[in-house]
């Protein structure tokens, strides 16, 4: 069997080498010719899996090691009779930890604020519910908005109420453009007008959920602290926007070693189910041991002392700013940052909690 895989997928050879010939390709530039005689295609979010890519091919299975599916033309896949799978929730823990790290980087005193600090979570799916749990471990008050999901453990509120009451807002929704609850440009001029000027905004979901022009106007007006891991016009990022952000990172919020490995394992399991193979591999067997920070110490004390050792978000911010050339970060530089990213470990690898 011929298997075409994005060259940046983790542990591809470990999970798939026994099934056939794996050809590693650059995901963003994948062509119909690359996949024409392949039976399986393994991708990330940078590959648009559409009708022009998959029609008249030997493909029987497409696996995307990602939470989202907006890069997959599901209708075209099903029309062609191609089984598809994604990895919903694979890096949810990593994203939740990213958000908390960003907040503590901006204001370390949040560790002491308990319920005086209100975190508003927009989207209560795989990431949102984990973030809520982790935030409550720190004593923060959590409010959430999701038209499709209610969490018993938090206060569920309207979108407008969340915008007005939260001290920080973190976005965790898929990108949708149709329907009553479309998320495209959910954060527009009207939403920014409802936010308190000192409310922190974090987007680690999908870039176009935030209308960039409205965001720029809002920061100019309020001097709001904004953290972006995703961008509306990604992979190209303007220097104008970058200079306004409190923190910027190159779409790596979910880039933990565990998250990457878990994503590949999830599409491996779906692959095995499709082709009738036994599922007998686990990513945990491939991960090196880490220093234990948490098990013998208080959670807040560890985060106060070790947070930048567990994940140095300031370095990621510096790296993306160093890529500015002629007024912008270009696609090649952005992709290289992601390709060469030194995968961090989740808190649990250091003996810490996980949701």
UniProtKB/Swiss-Prot annotation:
EC number: 1.1.1.290
Pfam families named in the record: 2-Hacid_dh, 2-Hacid_dh_C, DUF3410
Catalyzed reactions: 4-phospho-D-erythronate + NAD(+) = (R)-3-hydroxy-2-oxo-4-phosphooxybutanoate + NADH + H(+)
GO cellular component labels: cytoplasm
GO molecular function terms listed in the Swiss-Prot or TrEMBL record: 4-phosphoerythronate dehydrogenase activity; NAD binding; protein dimerization activity
InterPro entries in the record: D-iso_2-hydroxyacid_DH_PdxB, D-isomer_2_OHA_DH_cat_dom, D-isomer_DH_CS1, D-isomer_DH_NAD-bd, Erythronate-4-P_DHase, Erythronate-4-P_DHase_dimer, NAD(P)-bd_dom_sf, PdxB_dimer_sf
Residues that hold substrate according to the record: 45, 66, 255
Compartments where located: Cytoplasm
UniProt binding sites for NAD(+): 146, 229, 254
Single Gene Ontology BP annotation: pyridoxine biosynthetic process
Pathway annotation: Cofactor biosynthesis; pyridoxine 5'-phosphate biosynthesis; pyridoxine 5'-phosphate from D-erythrose 4-phosphate: step 2/5
PROSITE patterns xrefs: D_2_HYDROXYACID_DH_1
Chief place of localization: cytoplasm
Major enzyme class: oxidoreductase
Keywords attached to this entry: Cytoplasm, NAD, Oxidoreductase, Pyridoxine biosynthesis
Oligomeric form and interacting partners: Homodimer.
Alphabetical list of HAMAP family matching this protein: PdxB
Protein known as: Erythronate-4-phosphate dehydrogenase
Gene field: pdxB
């Amino acid at each position: 069997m011929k298997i075409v895989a994005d060259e940046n997928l983790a542990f591809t050879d470990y999970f798939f080498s026994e099934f056939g010939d794996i050809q590693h390709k650059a995901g963003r530039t994948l062509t119909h010719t690359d996949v024409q005689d392949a039976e399986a295609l393994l991708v990330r979010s940078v590959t648009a899996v559409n009708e022009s890519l998959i029609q008249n091919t030997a493909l029987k299975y497409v696996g995307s090691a990602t939470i989202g599916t907006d890069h997959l033309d599901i209708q075209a896949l099903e029309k062609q009779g191609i089984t598809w799978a994604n990895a919903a929730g694979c890096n949810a823990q990593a994203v939740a930890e990213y958000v908390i790290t960003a907040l503590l980087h901006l204001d370390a005193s949040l560790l002491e604020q308990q319920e005086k600090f209100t975190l508003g979570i927009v989207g209560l799916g795989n990431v949102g519910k984990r973030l809520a749990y982790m935030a409550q471990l720190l004593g923060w008050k959590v409010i959430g908005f999701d038209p499709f999901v209610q969490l018993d453990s938090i206060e569920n509120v309207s979108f407008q109420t969340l915008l007005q009451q939260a001290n920080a807002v973190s976005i965790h929704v898929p990108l949708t453009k149709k329907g009553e609850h479309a998320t495209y440009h959910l954060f527009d001029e009207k939403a920014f007008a409802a936010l308190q000027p000192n409310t922190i905004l974090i987007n680690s979901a999908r870039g176009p959920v935030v209308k960039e022009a409205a965001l720029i106007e809002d920061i100019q007006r309020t001097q709001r602290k904004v953290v972006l891991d995703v961008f509306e016009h990604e992979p190209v990022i303007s220097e104008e926007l970058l200079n306004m952000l409190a923190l910027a990172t190159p779409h790596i919020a979910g880039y933990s070693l565990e998250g990457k490995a878990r994503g590949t394992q999830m599409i491996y399991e779906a692959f095995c189910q499709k082709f009738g193979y036994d599922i007998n591999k686990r990513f945990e067997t491939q991960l090196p041991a880490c220093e234990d920070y948490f098990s013998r110490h208080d959670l807040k004390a560890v985060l106060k002392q070790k947070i930048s050792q567990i994940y140095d978000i300031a370095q990621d911010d510096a790296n993306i700013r160093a890529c500015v050339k002629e007024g912008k970060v270009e696609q090649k530089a952005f992709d290289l940052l992601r390709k060469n990213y030194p995968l961090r470990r989740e808190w649990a690898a250091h003996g810490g909690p996980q949701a």
